[in-house]
């Protein structure tokens, strides 16, 4: 059985931001529990990047708009024969609940911004080697606290993002499920099509080909060029089959 590699590419700025936030939140939990300096730096670096992303746009506003848009889309299925009405109504209620929690939550990331340890580490992350024990004695002593005490603090930090995480997960799940994968074929390593107001491209490609896509475009039109991983000896077949979903 062939191994398929999934590539996702945003077709607008809001989706680009959402995917970056999703990625960074996932990275926060990869190396938990924090048991050493390397794990701590991985965690705090991702927290810092997450706060940087929050400061660049109206994340809450865009998510609330999308939660409302998804509710309106689901409401068009109410009363349609053959559609699981209880499932539709449950999703609408979940979207409403996520929106209510998000709109009443404090400023996104504010709890993390105000934490003294996070602020101290953020100041040193841009300096090469700037998180040594003599630069950050606060972090050094924190790493020697009882594991349970560190775990509790990390859980509190991550929990402060729950209103955002819950809303973002629902929105991205619905967008990803909004379009099926369809077989497409590129000619001489190139494929282009209309986006149909899509927010996100999802592309399944066989690992056997050892190719990756370079995608450009926006919601109304996009182009994909397939490139060999081995730039010197790799080849792109004249015809290449892949699966594509415009979500």
Curated annotation (Swiss-Prot):
One of its GO terms (molecular function) is identical protein binding. GO terms for biological process: division septum assembly; FtsZ-dependent cytokinesis. It is found in: Cytoplasm. One of its GO terms (cellular component) is cytosol. InterPro entries: ZapD, ZapD_C, ZapD_sf. Keywords: Cell cycle, Cell division, Cytoplasm, Septation. It comes from the Bacteria. Transmembrane segments: none annotated. Its main location: cytoplasm. Disruption phenotype: Mutants are viable, with no discernible division phenotypes. It holds the Pfam family ZapD. HAMAP family: ZapD. Mostly homodimer in solution. Interacts with the C-terminal tail of FtsZ. Cell division factor that enhances FtsZ-ring assembly. Directly interacts with FtsZ and promotes bundling of FtsZ protofilaments, with a reduction in FtsZ GTPase activity. Belongs to the ZapD family. This is Cell division protein ZapD. The lineage of its organism: Bacteria, Pseudomonadati, Pseudomonadota, Gammaproteobacteria, Enterobacterales.
């Amino acid at each position: 059985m062939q191994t398929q590699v999934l590539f996702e590419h945003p077709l607008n700025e809001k989706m680009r931001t959402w995917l970056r936030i999703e990625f960074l939140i996932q990275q926060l939990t990869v190396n938990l529990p924090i048991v050493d300096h390397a794990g701590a730096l991985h965690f705090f670096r991702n927290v810092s990047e997450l706060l940087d992303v929050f400061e660049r746009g109206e994340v809450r506003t865009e998510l609330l708009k999308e939660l409302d848009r998804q509710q309106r889309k689901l409401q068009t299925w109410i009363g349609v024969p053959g559609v699981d009405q209880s499932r539709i109504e449950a999703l609408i209620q979940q979207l409403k609940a996520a929106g209510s929690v998000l709109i009443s939550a404090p400023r996104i990331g504010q709890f993390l911004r105000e934490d003294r340890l996070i602020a101290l580490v953020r100041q040193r992350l841009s300096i090469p080697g700037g998180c040594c024990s003599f630069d950050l004695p606060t972090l050094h002593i924190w790493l020697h606290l009882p594991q349970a005490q560190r775990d509790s603090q990390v859980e509190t930090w991550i929990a402060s993002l729950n209103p955002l995480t819950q809303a973002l997960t629902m929105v991205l799940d619905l967008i990803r499920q909004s379009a099926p994968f369809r077989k497409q074929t590129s000619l001489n390593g190139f494929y282009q099509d209309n986006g149909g107001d899509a927010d996100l491209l999802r592309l399944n490609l066989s690992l056997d080909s050892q190719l990756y896509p370079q995608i450009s475009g926006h919601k109304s039109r996009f182009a994909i060029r397939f490139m060999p991983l081995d730039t010197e000896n790799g080849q792109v077949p004249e015809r290449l089959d892949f699966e594509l979903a415009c979500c």
